[in-house]
Every structure is written in structure tokens, then in C-alpha cells.
């Protein structure tokens, strides 16, 4: 199948690549603002634009698909899927339960974690709910052991020790129509995404929890750096969790605390899942601390996205391109 992507792949390596926004492209972007369209803009897609407008164009406008290879072993995305599915099975037990520490400790003692991890592997990777560990390869047994260790030694003991919360939602859709101004007047982008977990904290605020399997990134150089900093300062996990907190705040009228659960680090006694703002010196800031400037930057970014005079340009930071599905087109 031949796909027209609007890019001359014969350009010299030094030529910057950009795609101008013609009428057809503006119509496709209109899906995210049209109330009649089911299309929504996820926090992941929004960050994709912040990091590299051209990558956003390839993925969300031209809708190019990266080649899906059949993985012989569990890759990083599948590892994350298994972990998320196992957590959801376990935490479904405590939805609505205030101060669930004792229940979590009992689940650890009763050996429920390994069973939930096995069920997650069977359903998501083997796609055979009746499978047993006898069907697991060496790699799959290792994945089972690692996920079990992360949950039994990190996530669940952490929550049991800091249980001033009530889980109110798991894998729950959060959405908000964010208003901003374009040349044609005021419109609204339909943001929507699936929050891993939403907690009600004892002090009356909410917490949006995002489970992460990668290396911890909780420090950032102020909210402005997430949008305009050098490549490595634009931290996707922090920007995205702030977007989820914004959607909760705007739809429920309650402040929200962004929390990143980096599962590989949660066995450390000093682990904190809250954001560490090096610009203000604040650790654990709630959304309203950032709301005014954050929403201003979101509005400016959306105004640029919907400005027909601003083409989709490739990012300047080549490090961003290392793991991009489309770097062959850009020759980076």
C-alpha cells in the first residue's frame, strides 16, 4: 500500500524537513476540535507535538503506522501491559476502601500477587487464560518474577505504608474540552486519556497515579522547561501526568496531585512519587500550583498547532530521534 506523507524523502540530510498545513491537513486537525467527531487528543499525542511537531504529523495527522513485528520475547511495551493488568486485578479488590493498608498487606501474605501476574501474562501475552507456568519460556518466567518482585517488594508495600487514600478509579477515562483561541475565534481541543489510577486523598484532594517501568524522572526545571526546554528537559511523563491532573481539576473542581510510580525504584525507603520542581524548590506540588502558567503554555502550543502558517517542523534535538519510529524518513 502506498501512502502519501507529504515529505520529499530525497532531500539531502542537511535539509530541514517540514510539512506545510494545507486545507486537507487543517481538516484532519479539525477532528480534535469537532464536537461531532469521536477523535480525541491524548496526553501522549500532545507531548509528541511538544517534543517534535513532525513526529506528531506522521503519527496523528498522516496516521503512519510503525511496522509491527511479532516479538519472540516480551518487549518493553508488553512488559508494561502485563504490569498494568496485574496491578488492576489486585487493586480492584480495594476500590472504595479507605485506608487499605491492612488489605494490601494481607494480599501480599496470601500470595495473591503471583497469581495476578500469571493471569495478566496469560491474557495479554499468551492470550490463553487457561495457560499455566508450564507453558512459560525462560524469558516469560523471568518477566513473571520481575513484575511480581516490583509489586510485592515496591508498589504494594509503599501503598500499605502510606495508605491515607481511597482508590476511586482504575483505568478510567478522563476527558476535558480545553478552550483556546485561533485565528478563526475560540475553539476547544478534546483532550482524553486513560488514567491508570485515581485516588481520593484524606485531605479532600485527588491523586492521579501513573505506573512507569522505566528509569525514574521526577525532577524537572519548572513547568516552562517541559514545553520549551532543551530536549532532555521536556519530560513526557511529567507533562502528561500534569495534563491528567488538569483534566481532573477542570472537570471535578478538586485539586489533584500528580504521582509517578516508577516501579523499579519503589523498594527504596526514601522513595517519593511526587514531582520535584527544581525551579521553585517545591516537592509534591498539587496541580493548582502550576495551573495558570501550565494552561497558558498549553493554549500557546495548541494555537501554534492550529495556525495554518506554522508548518510541522522536525525537532532540533537529534537525541529525541533515537527511538522515533519515523527517523528513517528524517534520515536521523
Where do the PLM segments sit?
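Metal-dependent nuclease catalytic regions and adjoining charged, substrate-binding loops involved
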Residues: 125, 233-238, 243-332
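Short, contiguous acidic/charged loop-to-helix segments that flank catalytic cores in large enzymes
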Residues: 70-74, 78, 138-142, 181-189, ...
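C-terminal, charged and often intrinsically disordered regions of DNA end-processing helicases
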Residues: 1-93, 306, 317-318, 326, ...
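Active-site-adjacent bridging/hinge elements
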Residues: 53-65, 121-126, 206-222, 271-273, ...
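Hydrophobic, well-ordered secondary-structure elements that form the walls
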Residues: 52, 83, 151, 197, ...
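Flexible loop/turn segments at secondary-structure boundaries
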Residues: 64-68, 176-180, 207, 215-219, ...
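Non-catalytic protein-protein interaction segments used by genome-maintenance enzymes to assemble
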Residues: 169-251
Amino acid at each position: 500500500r502506498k501512502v502519501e506523507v507529504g515529505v520529499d524523502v530525497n532531500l539531502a540530510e542537511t535539509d530541514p524537513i517540514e510539512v506545510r498545513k494545507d486545507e486537507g491537513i487543517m481538516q484532519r486537525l479539525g477532528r480534535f476540535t469537532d464536537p461531532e467527531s469521536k477523535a480525541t487528543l491524548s496526553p501522549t499525542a500532545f507531548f509528541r507535538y511538544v517534543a517534535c511537531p513532525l513526529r506528531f504529523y506522521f503519527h496523528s495527522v498522516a496516521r503512519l503506522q510503525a511496522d509491527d513485528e511479532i516479538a519472540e520475547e516480551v518487549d518493553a511495551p508488553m512488559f508494561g501491559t502485563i504490569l498494568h493488568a496485574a496491578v488492576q486485578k489486585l487493586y480492584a479488590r480495594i476500590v472504595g476502601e479507605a485506608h487499605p493498608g491492612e488489605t494490601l498487606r494481607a494480599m501480599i501474605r496470601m500470595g495473591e500477587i503471583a497469581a495476578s501476574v500469571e493471569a495478566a501474562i496469560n491474557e495479554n501475552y499468551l492470550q490463553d487464560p487457561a495457560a499455566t507456568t508450564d507453558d512459560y519460556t525462560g524469558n516469560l518466567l523471568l518477566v513473571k518474577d520481575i513484575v511480581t518482585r516490583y509489586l510485592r517488594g515496591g508498589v504494594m508495600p509503599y501503598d500499605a505504608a502510606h495508605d491515607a487514600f481511597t482508590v476511586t478509579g482504575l483505568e478510567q477515562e478522563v476527558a476535558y474540552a480545553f478552550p483556546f483561541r485561533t485565528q478563526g475565534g475560540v475553539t476547544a481541543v478534546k483532550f482524553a486519556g486513560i488514567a491508570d489510577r485515581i485516588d481520593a486523598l484524606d485531605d479532600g484532594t485527588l491523586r492521579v497515579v501513573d505506573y512507569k517501568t522505566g528509569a525514574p524522572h521526577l525532577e524537572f526545571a519548572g513547568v516552562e522547561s517541559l514545553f520549551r526546554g532543551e530536549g532532555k528537559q521536556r519530560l513526557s511523563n511529567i507533562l502528561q501526568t500534569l495534563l491528567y491532573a488538569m483534566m481532573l481539576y477542570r472537570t471535578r473542581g478538586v485539586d489533584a496531585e500528580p504521582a509517578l510510580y516508577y516501579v523499579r525504584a519503589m523498594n527504596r525507603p526514601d522513595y517519593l512519587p511526587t514531582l520535584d520542581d527544581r525551579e521553585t524548590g517545591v516537592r509534591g506540588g498539587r496541580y493548582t500550583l502550576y495551573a495558570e502558567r501550565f494552561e497558558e503554555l498549553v493554549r500557546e502550543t495548541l494555537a501554534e498547532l492550529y495556525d495554518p502558517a506554522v508548518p510541522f517542523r522536525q525537532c532540533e534535538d537529534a537525541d529525541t530521534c533515537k527511538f522515533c519510529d519515523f527517523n528513517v524518513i528524517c534520515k536521523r
